[in-house]
C-alpha cells in the first residue's frame, strides 16, 4: 500500500536539533557518558566510573544494549546485525536520469521473508539507502560496523530484483546497524520495576515512532 504522508526522517539531524532544543530549555544531557547498570526499583544509574545518580524515574531505550542493562529482557528481545548500503544512482543510461527520478520516489519496503529490503530515496544530498530487512538475529553491538564488499553487494542484488537500473556496480559504501527484535515483532513499551520503563523490540522502526 502507499501512504501519502510518508517521508524520510534524517535521524542524525533530528537528534542533534532535539538535543539543542532541550539544552536551551534547561534539560541536562550527559553526552557520550555510558551507563553500566540501572536499578529500576530505586531509579539509580551507575556510570561505571565510580559515580552514580538517583533520579525520579528511568526510561530504558537502549536499543541492542538493552539486555546488558536489563537482563530480564534477554529472553524477550534479540540484537540483530543488519546491513545498510549506499548507492550512487546513474544520471544517464537506458532508463534515463535515475538520480533525479529517485529524489521524488517514496520509501519502499519489501517484506519478502527470504530477501526483504527497504529503500530510502536520496534527500538533501544523501545517496540512495538500501537495507536488508532479513533478520540475522546475531551479532554483538560492541563489534565494529564494517561490512564485507561481497555481503554489501548481495544486498544490492536482492533489491535489483525489484528495482530496475540498480546494480552492484553502483554500490558506494556499506555499514552495519542493529535492530532489537521481539519474536512476533511486537513493540515493548511497559513499566518495569518500581521506577522503570522499558522501550524495546522495535525491529528497526523505533525512531520514526519515537
Segments (PLM) and residue ranges:
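Structured beta->alpha junctions
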Residues: 7, 51, 123, 168, ...
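Short, surface-exposed beta-strand-loop junctions and turns on beta-sheet-rich folds
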Residues: 51-53, 136-137, 205
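Active-site substrate-recognition segment that forms the wall
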Residues: 57, 64-195
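Beta-strand residues in well-ordered beta-sheet regions across diverse protein folds
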Residues: 46-48, 131, 199-200
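Glycine-rich phosphate/pyrophosphate-binding beta-alpha loops
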Residues: 196-210
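Hydrophobic alpha-helical segments, especially transmembrane helices
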Residues: 26, 82-83, 206-209
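Helical element adjacent to the flavin cofactor pocket in flavoenzyme catalytic cores
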Residues: 2-48, 53-57, 61
Amino acid at each position: 500500500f502507499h501512504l501519502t504522508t510518508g517521508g524520510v526522517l534524517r535521524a542524525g539531524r533530528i537528534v542533534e536539533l532535539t538535543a539543542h532544543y532541550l539544552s536551551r530549555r534547561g534539560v541536562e544531557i550527559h553526552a557520550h557518558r555510558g551507563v553500566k547498570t540501572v536499578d529500576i526499583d530505586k531509579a539509580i544509574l551507575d556510570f561505571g566510573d565510580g559515580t552514580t545518580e538517583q533520579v525520579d524515574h528511568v526510561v530504558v531505550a537502549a536499543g541492542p544494549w538493552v539486555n546488558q542493562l536489563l537482563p530480564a529482557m534477554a529472553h524477550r528481545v534479540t540484537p540483530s546485525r543488519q546491513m545498510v548500503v549506499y548507492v550512487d544512482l546513474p544520471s544517464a543510461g537506458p532508463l534515463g536520469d535515475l538520480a533525479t527520478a529517485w529524489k521524488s520516489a517514496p520509501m519502499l519496503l519489501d517484506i519478502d521473508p527470504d530477501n526483504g529490503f527497504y529503500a530510502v530515496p536520496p534527500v538533501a544530498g544523501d545517496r540512495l539507502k538500501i537495507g536488508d530487512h532479513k533478520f540475522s538475529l546475531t551479532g554483538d553491538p560492541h563489534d565494529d560496523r564494517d561490512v564485507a564488499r561481497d555481503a554489501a553487494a548481495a544486498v544490492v542484488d536482492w533489491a535489483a530484483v525489484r528495482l530496475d537500473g540498480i546494480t552492484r556496480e553502483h554500490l558506494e559504501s556499506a555499514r552495519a546497524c542493529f535492530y532489537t527484535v521481539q519474536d512476533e515483532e511486537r513493540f515493548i513499551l511497559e513499566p518495569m520495576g518500581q521506577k522503570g520503563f522499558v522501550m524495546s523490540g522495535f525491529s528497526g522502526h523505533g525512531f520514526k515512532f519515537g
